[in-house]
């Protein structure tokens, strides 16, 4: 009877913690969104004032938006602390769920290597994502119709991405994850240069097929190797949380920069924009080389 009563008490405590986690998430996200919404009008005034002060509207916009992001994160964090202090969720449970997986990552790899790996994760897809944000607008500007874009870019491109994913998986098994990770990053950067050629040629369905084939094939290959790489970094005890953190970090900076793709194109044009996205891949290649020298990927793959 004592065991049954204890089990029921534990189940009730687990349900309370689950409800607490849910409420903490809802309140924190609501605070995050509300922070952006309530600061929208003030942000416009701040951008105008800062733009006149530093004589650079693009930099002023970026600085104000980063400040709004920081403020929203602080608000979300404070709300989470209030929920914890209220007793809706146990602080120990929050530590085990969110803090311990992060501590585990830094303890296993050490601070210097851990930051190197996080930098690699955060920058690996930057070339593809920043370019991809403006891709559809680019196709329309060249004169391609929406049905043509849907047929070539979406349908045919998806097929090439799947093929690239299979190829990336097979090559990772055969030659190792980091080698294919490097190859994927290199090809992703190089294929962005093909869009420069498409800019010069203009409307050409054959060339569009060639460019999409190369771009999506390399993207699929890189994605497969990257997923294998992320999986090898996680601890089996914290797989879900650590992988979720890595996946979020993977798109954070690229998505932020991608939001300014249109402004960049208006400023420097498509040719220089595609060149700049290709050059963004160079630091990634350097990080992969450094990571390869610092830890044994084969040991991780066998773990």
List the model feature ranges, each with a label.
Residues 233-267:
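A late C-terminal transmembrane helix in Major Facilitator Superfamily
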Residues 1, 220-239, 245:
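Intracellular juxtamembrane helix-capping segments at the cytosolic ends
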Residues 44-57, 133-150:
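Short amphipathic helix-loop junctions that connect adjacent transmembrane helices
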Residues 1-120, 288, 294-303:
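Intracellular loop-helix junctions on the cytosolic face of multi-pass helical membrane proteins
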């Amino acid at each position: 009877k004592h065991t049954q009563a204890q089990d029921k008490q534990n189940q009730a405590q687990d349900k309370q913690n689950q409800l607490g986690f849910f409420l903490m998430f809802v309140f924190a996200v609501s605070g995050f969104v509300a922070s952006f919404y309530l600061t929208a009008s003030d942000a416009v005034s701040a951008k105008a004032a800062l733009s006149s002060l530093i004589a650079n509207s693009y930099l002023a916009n970026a600085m104000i938006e980063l400040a709004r992001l920081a403020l929203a994160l602080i608000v979300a964090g404070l709300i989470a602390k209030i929920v914890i202090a209220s007793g809706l969720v146990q602080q120990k449970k929050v530590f085990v769920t969110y803090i311990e997986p992060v501590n585990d990552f830094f303890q296993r790899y050490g601070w210097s290597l851990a930051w190197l790996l996080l930098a690699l994760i955060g920058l690996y897809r930057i070339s593809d994502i920043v370019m991809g944000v403006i891709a559809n607008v680019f196709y329309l500007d060249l004169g391609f119709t929406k049905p043509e874009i849907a047929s070539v870019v979406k349908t045919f491109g998806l097929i090439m991405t799947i093929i690239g994913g299979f190829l990336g998986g097979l090559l990772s098994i055969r030659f190792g994850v980091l080698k294919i990770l490097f190859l994927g990053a290199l090809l992703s950067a190089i294929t962005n240069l093909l869009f420069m050629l498409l800019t010069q040629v203009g409307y050409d369905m054959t060339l569009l097929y060639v460019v999409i084939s190369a771009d999506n094939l390399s993207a699929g290959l890189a994605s497969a190797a990257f997923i294998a790489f992320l999986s090898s970094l996680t601890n089996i005890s914290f797989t879900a949380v650590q992988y979720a953190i890595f996946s979020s970090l993977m798109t954070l900076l690229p998505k932020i920069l991608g939001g300014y793709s249109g402004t960049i194109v208006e400023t420097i044009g498509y040719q220089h924009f595609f060149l700049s996205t290709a050059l963004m891949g160079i630091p990634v290649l350097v990080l992969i080389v450094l990571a390869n020298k610092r830890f044994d990927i084969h040991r991780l793959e066998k773990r």
